[in-house]
Amino acid sequence: MTTRRGQRRSASRRHIRPSSGGPGRRYIAAVGMAVLAAALAACGSSSGGSGSSSSTASVPAAKNLTQLRQSVTKASASVTGTYSPGPAIPDMASLKGKKIMALPGTTLIPTCLQDAETIKSIGDAAGTPVTMINDTGEISQWDSAIDTAITEHYSAVDFMCDDTPSLIIPEIEKAEAAGVKVFGYALTEPLKDYPGLAGGTLEPTYSDYSTMLDQAFVATGGKPINMLVISSVAVIGNAQDVAMLKAQFAKMCGSSCHIYVSDVEVPDWGTKIQPTVQTQLLTHPNINVVYPMFSGEYTYVLPAVEASHRSVLVTGAFGGGTPQVQLQTNSASNKIIIGDMTSDPVWAAYEMYYQTALDLAGQTMRPLSDTYTPNILITTANAGQVLTGAAWGYGFVNSYRKDLGLPPLSGAALQAAATVGS
């Protein structure tokens, strides 16, 4: 399927120059998805959908398992080649003293917290003092933080963690009117769809869905899948993403599979996702895949699946926070979690700060279409490399530091800078 997002993804490839013979990289969303595939024995007839059997004969994806396995292998390959962020900022001295607020979105999600911590580290080193807000995902906290940025004359707010700026557009417009620039992380739509937002970074989502479906069918050996999707359609673009996911799922699985959708909005994730998933698993015992569409949902989905006492495999894009990656190195949990499609929190944070600094220095920001960072499918096989930073390499750190007028790092200091939040 050709999509606008797919076109933007292709355009970004010029920023990673793969070494000769090295694997190409997928550029995909930080917006998280998870596939929790129940053991095949859990498959049964679908309530409200087509019956599901153990046969692969009627599943189109089963005919392409070799290709799907290649897709999964490619997605889990390490990043190779050199990286160039964009133009240098020669007047970084003019930014010294400008205050920046790092708003994690929620400190309860490891990757969101680690994104914000990295921005604080970079900004403090560059002379732009960064204040990090300790929020827990409540919209009222985000509104309050923006109000603080206005009254205390901050220059910018970096709003991290997925597409959450879409939920407080009026507050962002108020900040714009007061001269405070708000930047959004991992946006999924063009900037014009976010009134008041000064800029940010883009993460197209369709290729995520495609890769995760590939992984699900590989994990189930091409057998029929009955899937529960957890959406949050109040987030800009998510309703369209649900429609695209349904279309791709139907194309890959035909009439042998069934998809259920439960919508839980961001403010309700902490209280409603776990009981919603538990209820759906009880109501529809044929469900063998649970697919949260945002990284923050995974935290609440996994306990619900575990409480169902059904043998499960887990794969998805949970955001790459250290605790989640470490689960794949644990002998007990790595038999459950078989994949995590994610960007490097450090790399993503550098890109976000770089965009902010470009704008504050009066330079032209990079187009959103050029701002998303390379993702890797983390598995039990490469989780160790991810935790040491080796999967993404360390070169990107000094590339950004050069453009930001910061001295290069080497040795242990470079590795430490590249692995904060991995």
Predicted regions and their residues:
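C-terminal motif of bacterial Sec signal peptides marking the signal peptidase cleavage site
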Residues: 38-42
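Flexible loop/hinge segments that line or gate small-molecule binding clefts
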Residues: 61, 166, 171-207, 226, ...
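Hydrophobic alpha-helical segments within soluble ligand-binding/sensing domains
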Residues: 83, 87, 199-227, 240, ...
